[in-house]
Amino acid sequence: MGKNFHHPYQPYDIQTQLMEHIYELLNSGKKVGIFESPTGTGKTLSLICSTVTWLREHKLEKLNSKVDNDNLSDSTFSSSDDEPEWVNQFYNDKIMKEKSKSLQEYENYLEGLSMSNIKPVLRQLDIGDRKRKKTVPRHIEIEIEDDETNFLPEPYEQDSVSNQNDYEKGQINDEIQKLLAKIDKGYDVKTENNMELKSPLKIYFSSRTHSQLTQFASQLTLPSFPPSSPTLEKERIKFLPLASRKQLCIHAKVSKLKSDLINDACVETVKRQECQFYTNSRDLISSKQFRDYTFSEISDIEDLVQLGHSLHVCPYYSSRTALEGAEIVTLPYQHILSFEIRESLGINLKDSIVIIDEAHNLMDTITSIYSCEISLSDIKICKKLMKIYLNKFKRKLNGKNRVNIMKLMKLLDILQAFIESHFEKGKEISPQSMFRDSNADLLNIHELVTYMRGSKIAYKIDSYADSKLKSDESNTNSVKQPILFKISKFVLSLSNPSFEGSFFFEEGMIIKYMLLEPNQIFKTIVNDSKCVILAGGTMQPTSEFIENLLPFVPSKDIVQFSCNHIIPESNLDTFIVSEGFNFNYESRNNESVMCKLYDFLLELGCRVPHGIVVFFPSYGYLEHVIKFWQLEEIFEKLSMNKRIFYETPGGSDILPQYSSTILDKKKGAFLFSVVGGKLSEGINFQDNLARAVVMVGLPYPNLYSSELLVKKRHIEQKVISAGGSLKDAKSATIEFYENICMKAVNQSIGRAIRHANDYACIYLVDNRYLNNKVQHKLSEWVRKRVKSELKTSEIFAQTSVFFASNR
């Protein structure tokens, strides 16, 4: 009998295999695990059961170790060999009971809170009428007025130690977080002396969306784990969902601000002692109440917001206080990937387990977070706003502020002139070239960055502009995103190390900074934590992670495992439709190829019941094919067989109509989608919604896009600088290009099977899928079921047999 992972159901073999591999990774001391578990195979529960089982066992070992260490340091205890073994054991048991007593009392207390059906009670409580002893007096909340003095720059000292430290710790796009550092570090609530209630080793679970984190919380309620102490009858999981101020703020006015402004507005409000929620959350009794209510049952972010309202405390700051005792913490990507956010929240990854779910897009996410851009239009708007601000406040600004604002305007003038005179799409540029032909010798980027951080001038100008736009009801040119923050972020990027990223011109008169070395950001996470688990439904090709994200991790410290699917072998067939099909750039617009695709889909529609999802490589090609079929007057015939829905860029959501057609019409429907579009990721095409998934061609990205050209040059330079040949460099860029394509293929066709009883066929329509290298980069559960070297007629025949046997 294998290891008991306390799975709430009888796990499938592949779930057991995944849990065993994760558990072995944690026991082995290796640093990184890359795990692929197809959607619908219970990946989340497998992650929970394996990691929490290990965590509880590890805590028990730590507790026993702590007892032994305490015994050795106890002067009343003799470790002499003359002491009978039963005496030693009796003493150990006594110490264990004493240390477990407080844990049991706390568990009993939490059980009482849980049994009291706390949520309805909290909603009815009138906290204002409750008489409780407060160690910190409550402040009467003062509404933030549009007092014009609030828009003046914050006092700062240009050469102060604090400003210098802020600059040195600055990251690529973390200006906002650095502005919060002072107030965040000043947040100091007294902690309990009871060390047993703390949980130094934690599981941090991060995913892309709020809904995915909420789903994790709901799954966490299903299993039941043994306690970490043998004397405990039961031990509930101490779970804490961390979130941003935008999600947790309950201040009436601050919570309504744009996400780019809310962080600084929070700092401003706290500094002026105008947020009673923050003041109350500094109180020991209130912060403990928030923690205990949170730990009494599995709570999501909405529960924390409700709890904050009920207890009249700030959920954001109170959740940070609860962090110390949490065993499992969920948080969005940005919170785990940004060093500055981790620092401000008090997140210490030392010896902890970091799980990054939906990790197939991890590198793209890191690149996106740490990249920025400004357009010529942004610069012009920013200059206009700064002039309005100067005209309004020039008499109230001191000399230093006026000088620094004028320097910022000078910087904008230089950038505007540079874009207007040097723009060439795709051209890489250096920060030095931006200032080479200007009299920028009087500008010091370091000093400007320090000034912007210390004075919060970006927040001041943006919030003043926002207030004026709101007061002018006739103004229709409201800026959707605070412009000064974009400028501020770009100025910060000018001081980044050149090897980490690159500046280049993008279409639309834009200067873009793009991070090129995401491994530099990820390295601190891997080094600090005990172990990092990268999990996803489609992680192939994993070479992308190993070469570009984890080059600093020795191969012996990386574990890889790819699950098969839980469905029977007979529930999925994968066909390579190669006969006469090649959708490369040279031939895909040939009329014969588009006609052949039409014939294939027409016949397929007669043999596949219900829904068929067809993925095209781009919106442009989808539109081109449909127009051709319409001109040939054959499109209508295809739609007579099955109704056709097709995705358009920026178009309305067609999924509800498609779904209702599948439910209402026996003949079913086609859904023409685009790889990388809204329907290619995150949407479940289960059961009749996708009895077949068709991939038209290989969706290689545009090789001549500015971003891809910059990345290509960077990869080539890296290979050559490491001693590689031109041939090696070329090979590396081809590998990079293929990985982007195959990652997109896997994401799209992974929509086909969503649960154990689902069934479908996958059709890879292009003779290039016969290439072994291409097939090797398919997800393993798809690759194992590939049927190649079949004629189209044989594919249709086997399709009919497949659906006849699966009715």
From Swiss-Prot:
InterPro entries referenced in this protein's UniProt entry, alphabetically: ATP-dep_Helicase_C, DinG/Rad3-like, DNA/RNA_helicase_DEAH_CS, Helic_SF1/SF2_ATP-bd_DinG/Rad3, Helicase-like_DEXD_c2, P-loop_NTPase, RAD3-like_helicase_DEAD, Rad3/Chl1-like
Motif extent (DEAH box): 357-360
Entry's family note: Belongs to the DEAD box helicase family. DEAH subfamily. DDX11/CHL1 sub-subfamily.
Catalytic reaction annotation: Couples ATP hydrolysis with the unwinding of duplex DNA at the replication fork by translocating in the 5'-3' direction. This creates two antiparallel DNA single strands (ssDNA). The leading ssDNA polymer is the template for DNA polymerase III holoenzyme which synthesizes a continuous strand; ATP + H2O = ADP + phosphate + H(+)
Protein keywords: ATP-binding, Cell cycle, DNA-binding, Helicase, Hydrolase, Iron, Iron-sulfur, Isomerase, Metal-binding, Nucleotide-binding, Nucleus
Organism, as annotated: Kluyveromyces lactis (strain ATCC 8585 / CBS 2359 / DSM 70799 / NBRC 1267 / NRRL Y-1140 / WM37)
Protein name: ATP-dependent DNA helicase CHL1
Annotated residues for binding of ATP: 37-44
Taxonomic placement: Eukaryota, Fungi, Dikarya, Ascomycota, Saccharomycotina
A Pfam family hit: DEAD_2
Signal peptide coordinates: none
This protein's encoding gene: CHL1
Role, per record: ATP-dependent DNA helicase important for chromosome transmission and normal cell cycle progression in G(2)/M. May have a role in changing DNA topology to allow the loading of proteins involved in maintaining sister chromatid cohesion in the vicinity of the centromeres. Has a specific role in chromosome segregation during meiosis II.
EC number, as in UniProt: 5.6.2.3
